[in-house]
């Protein structure tokens, strides 16, 4: 884009429209993260300029962190602004508490993003601009970040895995000075956060103490450093493409082959692991922790179990295959649940659904269950099972081990009991004593993990 000194408000409008049109489509729902500061006020003003012609559904969200004594006034300002523009606004009030070794800025950002995840929108619009991007680059340099971190903030990214809502920063290539010019030209009002002057925060110290000196020596530093973030973004994209190639060669049914990972050169192994973690949108580990994960993976025996927690993710390895599982969603063994003939039985503690259907020549003999108490529960130990009538009854533990199921899967498989007799084991089969005779209609049970929200009970 042109040098910031030559940009007029009209050019800013054109630049914003270009950024917007390149990403959104008619009918998209856009929610502005509105703090009340000049950046987000200008973003909302620009967006309302084009919302009707582009057929966009615009709303706003304000998060009151409760950190400043003025936070209530800022909420009232945002409400008044949105009322004047006929823009729906949702206000969320929080109490932010400091955590050891974490900045207040990072804690507040995490809290905001948790709220954003529940917004009914296609995009959450953020008002970060070119100066913010340059500051982020310098702060990342001071932290010793790699290529991914030095590419700073992406213009667009998914907010969380498996969802469609995205974060969008349409002002990222526009300097702060021109945003201020636009606000003054259009007579906009905004609030000022007094904490922006507190130089105990690294970003504020950089903004007020360091960058003015840098500008004296290199007036165009914003433009040149912003260009560096773009170059680094391209390099990060190429590293992601390399990781995708390595992933294709090392992934086995969505699990990472330990042997395949070990065959890679150390730099490529680090790149692949970093990429797979980033795909799950967690806070990436620093280089020391990443090296420790790889060291342990390189030293364990293929038959050994491995567990390592990174942010909200748990890395587990079993029989040479590495899985990435949400640490807070690993199910616990369940208490007995009585089945009363439902077609769908939700097992919330196991995060899945049992589906019961009738089919010819297969399944459980319904007559064996008639008049009996049928329950679903997890293993308690000592169960014996005979899914193959040509083989003797054996311990369920041994059968599950032979099926190469990971220990954390074995302990949370749903089992169907008729009174005290084990009838069916998910993924294994039906006990001989309960299998349907040929020519009859049987009850087929199927286990569908992670489908709680996809079915209704009958």
UniProtKB/Swiss-Prot annotation:
Known EC number: 6.3.4.19
Residues at which ATP binds: 35-40
Broad class of the protein's primary localization: cytoplasm
Reactions accelerated catalytically: cytidine(34) in tRNA(Ile2) + L-lysine + ATP = lysidine(34) in tRNA(Ile2) + AMP + diphosphate + H(+)
CDD domains assigned: TilS_N
The keyword Hydrolase belongs to this UniProt entry's keyword annotation: no
SUPFAM superfamilies to which the protein is assigned, alphabetical: Adenine nucleotide alpha hydrolases-like, MesJ substrate recognition domain-like, PheT/TilS domain
Cysteine pairings via disulfide bonds: none
Superkingdom of origin: Bacteria
EC primary class: ligase
Keyword ATP-binding: yes
Pfam families: ATP_bind_3, TilS, TilS_C
GO annotation terms (biological process): tRNA modification
UniProt cross-references to InterPro entries, sorted A to Z: Lysidine-tRNA-synth_C (IPR012796), Rossmann-like_a/b/a_fold (IPR014729), TilS/TtcA_N (IPR011063), tRNA_Ile_lys_synt (IPR012094), tRNA_Ile_lys_synt_N (IPR012795), tRNA_Ile_lys_synt_subst-bd (IPR015262)
Molecular functions per Gene Ontology: ATP binding; tRNA(Ile)-lysidine synthase activity
Keywords associated with the record: ATP-binding, Cytoplasm, Ligase, Nucleotide-binding, tRNA processing
Function of the molecule: Ligates lysine onto the cytidine present at position 34 of the AUA codon-specific tRNA(Ile) that contains the anticodon CAU, in an ATP-dependent manner. Cytidine is converted to lysidine, thus changing the amino acid specificity of the tRNA from methionine to isoleucine.
Family per similarity comment: Belongs to the tRNA(Ile)-lysidine synthase family.
Domain description: The N-terminal region contains the highly conserved SGGXDS motif, predicted to be a P-loop motif involved in ATP binding.
Entry protein name: tRNA(Ile)-lysidine synthase
Species of provenance: Nitrosomonas europaea (strain ATCC 19718 / CIP 103999 / KCTC 2705 / NBRC 14298)
């Amino acid at each position: 884009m042109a040098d910031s000194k030559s940009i007029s408000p009209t050019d800013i409008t054109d630049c914003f429209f270009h950024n917007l049109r390149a990403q959104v489509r008619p009918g998209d729902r856009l929610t502005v993260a509105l703090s009340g500061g000049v950046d987000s006020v200008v973003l909302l003003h620009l967006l309302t300029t084009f919302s009707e012609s582009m057929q966009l559904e615009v709303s706003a969200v304000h998060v009151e962190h409760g950190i400043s004594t003025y936070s209530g006034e800022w909420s009232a300002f945002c409400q008044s602004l949105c009322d004047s523009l006929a823009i729906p606004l949702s206000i969320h009030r929080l109490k932010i508490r400091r955590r050891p070794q974490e900045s207040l800025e990072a804690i507040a950002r995490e809290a905001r993003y948790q709220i954003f995840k529940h917004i009914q929108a296609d995009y959450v619009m953020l008002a970060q601009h070119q100066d913010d991007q340059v500051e982020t680059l310098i702060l990342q340099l001071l932290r010793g970040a790699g290529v991914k971190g030095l590419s700073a903030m992406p213009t667009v990214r998914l907010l969380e895995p498996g969802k469609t809502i995205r974060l969008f920063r349409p002002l990222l290539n526009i300097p702060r000075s021109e945003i201020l010019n636009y606000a003054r030209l259009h007579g906009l009002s905004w609030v000022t956060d007094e904490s922006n002057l507190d130089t105990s925060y690294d970003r504020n110290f950089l903004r007020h103490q360091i960058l003015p000196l840098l500008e004296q020596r290199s007036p165009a530093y914003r433009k040149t450093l912003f260009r560096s973030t773009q170059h680094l973004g391209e390099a990060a994209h190429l590293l992601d493409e390399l990781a995708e190639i390595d992933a294709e060669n090392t992934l086995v049914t969505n699990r990472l082959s330990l042997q395949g990972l070990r065959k890679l050169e150390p730099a490529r192994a680090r790149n692949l692991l970093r990429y797979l973690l980033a795909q799950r949108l967690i806070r990436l580990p620093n280089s020391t922790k990443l090296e420790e994960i790889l060291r342990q993976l390189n030293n364990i025996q293929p038959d050994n179990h491995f567990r390592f927690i990174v942010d909200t993710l748990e890395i587990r390895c079993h029989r040479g295959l590495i899985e990435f599982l949400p640490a807070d969603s690993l199910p616990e063994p369940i208490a007995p649940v009585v089945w009363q003939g439902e077609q769908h039985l939700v097992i919330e503690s196991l995060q899945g659904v049992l589906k019961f259907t009738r089919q010819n020549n297969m399944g459980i003999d319904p007559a064996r269950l008639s008049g009996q108490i049928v329950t679903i529960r997890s293993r308690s130990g000592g169960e014996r099972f005979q899914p193959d009538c040509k083989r003797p009854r054996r311990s369920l533990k041994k059968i599950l081990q032979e099926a190469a199921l990971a220990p954390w899967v074995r302990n949370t498989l749903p089992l169907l009991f008729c009174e005290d007799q084990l009838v069916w084991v998910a993924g294994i089969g039906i006990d001989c004593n309960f299998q349907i005779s040929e020519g009859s209609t049987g009850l087929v049970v199927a286990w569908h993990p992670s489908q709680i929200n996809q079915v209704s009970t009958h």
